[in-house]
Design a protein with these regions (language model features):
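Phosphate-end processing signature that detects enzymes handling 5′-triphosphorylated RNA
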Residues: 2-227
């Protein structure tokens, strides 16, 4: 049994190394842009299109996009860690609105960029026109719950009783971010997604047993001003 486990782990490691090599080769073919260039595209009011595919297909898909996009690069890497904490009301109102595909629905989250040690409070609204409108402010990296200033900002986005929002889910993942040469759209690839859900009536505790991952899938998102 131990031998079988060792062989299984060895195969997983070799497979991971092959994937990382293929991914690095695909990304090396891209022209690169920096964060200043990426931020020059104003897509805070946009149309989103999402796609799901197998992680093993990512290197090939990247190779097919190289003629149309450049890749964000910082500190000599094009693959970045993201950490999101999603907030909701105790009755899961925000989640249920999303699940039931209601329009004029919201998401509230903290987004942390470990590479640059920065953190933002973000409110995303899906309008009745099918557009995504995002508003965000920079917050201290140590913030974990909705404070007074955060609550004011959230209320300004049309969400009532923001002080009753509590963290419900944590999500960690890797992202590759692209922009087209016309500087009119972004394309992101999220993978190695890990989720951890909150339990009990606590602002800080997350259930280590209630976690799951989408290790074999990639979520691609195309962000455009219009279709």
């Amino acid at each position: 049994l131990l031998y079988c486990l060792f062989i299984s782990e060895l195969c997983d490691m070799l497979s991971s190394n092959d994937f990382n090599s293929s991914l690095a080769f695909s990304l090396d073919q891209y022209k690169k842009h920096d964060l200043v260039k990426a931020d020059s595209i104003d897509l805070m009011n946009r149309v989103d299109s999402k796609f799901l595919f197998r992680l093993s297909e990512l290197p090939k898909i990247l190779e097919e996009c190289v003629s149309s996009y450049s890749a964000l690069q910082m500190l000599k890497t094009c693959v970045f860690a993201y950490k999101n904490t999603y907030f909701d009301f105790p009755d899961y109102h925000l989640y249920l609105s999303h699940h039931n595909k209601k329009l004029n629905r919201n998401k509230v989250r903290f987004r942390t960029y470990p590479k640059t040690e920065t953190k933002f409070l973000e409110v995303k609204t899906k309008t009745n026109k099918g557009r995504t409108v995002k508003a965000r402010i920079k917050i201290p990296i140590e913030n974990k719950v909705i404070g007074e200033e955060n609550a004011i900002f959230i209320a300004e986005q049309g969400i009532t009783n923001p002080k009753t929002l509590v963290p419900m889910q944590m999500c960690n993942y890797k992202r590759i971010s692209m922009m087209d040469y016309g500087a009119s759209e972004r394309l992101t690839f999220d993978f190695h997604l890990h989720y951890n859900c909150r339990y009990e009536n606590s602002n800080e505790r997350f259930d280590k047993e209630a976690n799951f991952e989408l290790g074999d899938f990639v979520i691609a998102e195309l962000k455009q001003n219009k279709l």
